[in-house]
């Protein structure tokens, strides 16, 4: 497509800090695809409802890129960082047999169970993306200046389900996909610089 900066390999190279070659390629291809679709949208002079699928696709691509990079860096590069350990733990009640087997306590008609309140591991897919971005900001590989826009792009992707769109009367706009694009290069530069300076 005319005026698309760089070929596919250029886009892949923007993720040079990702050591996994398959993930790096797929991230680059997603970036290239988002840019390609934007240029295609421009070339076809679409507007109104005809523009909607182009914008929706771009938001989905950029949100997926942000998510994949943040998750990969948190759990592959910084899995031993104190912030990541905190992110993956929560307090939970764990039942224990503190009383003799024949002893039973009740509150009205309900049986009372003894428990301890201790740290428990939170499954990665149960951690909200907003919390992952905040953790990345505290570690330093995501700039606080762009964190809210990254979270918003991800929220828009999740709100792109037709039923949710209808219930909340939401429309994705071209400006939202442009913001997702404009934030990506500084996001990648911040990650690259931080990893280089910290030997990660």
Cite the ranges covered by each PLM segment.
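Short, flexible helix-adjacent loops and helix caps
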Residues: 42-46, 74, 78, 165-169
């Amino acid at each position: 497509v005319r005026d698309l900066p760089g070929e596919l390999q250029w886009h892949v190279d923007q993720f040079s800090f990702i050591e996994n070659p398959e993930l790096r390629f797929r991230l680059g291809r997603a970036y290239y695809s988002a840019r390609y679709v934007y240029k295609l949208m421009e070339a076809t002079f679409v507007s109104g409802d005809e523009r909607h699928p182009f914008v929706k696709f771009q938001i989905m691509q950029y949100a997926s890129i942000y998510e994949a990079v943040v998750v990969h860096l948190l759990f592959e590069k910084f899995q031993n960082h104190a912030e990541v350990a905190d992110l993956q733990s929560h307090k939970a009640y764990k039942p224990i047999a503190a009383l003799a087997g024949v002893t039973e306590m009740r509150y009205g008609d309900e049986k009372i169970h003894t428990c301890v309140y201790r740290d428990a591991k939170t499954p990665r897919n149960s951690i909200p993306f907003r919390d992952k971005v905040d953790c990345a900001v505290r570690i330093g590989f995501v700039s606080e200046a762009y964190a809210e826009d990254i979270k918003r792009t991800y929220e828009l992707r999740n709100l792109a389900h037709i039923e949710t769109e209808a219930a909340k009367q939401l429309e994705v706009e071209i400006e939202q996909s442009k913001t997702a694009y404009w934030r990506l290069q500084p996001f990648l530069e911040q990650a690259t610089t931080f990893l280089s300076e910290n030997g990660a």
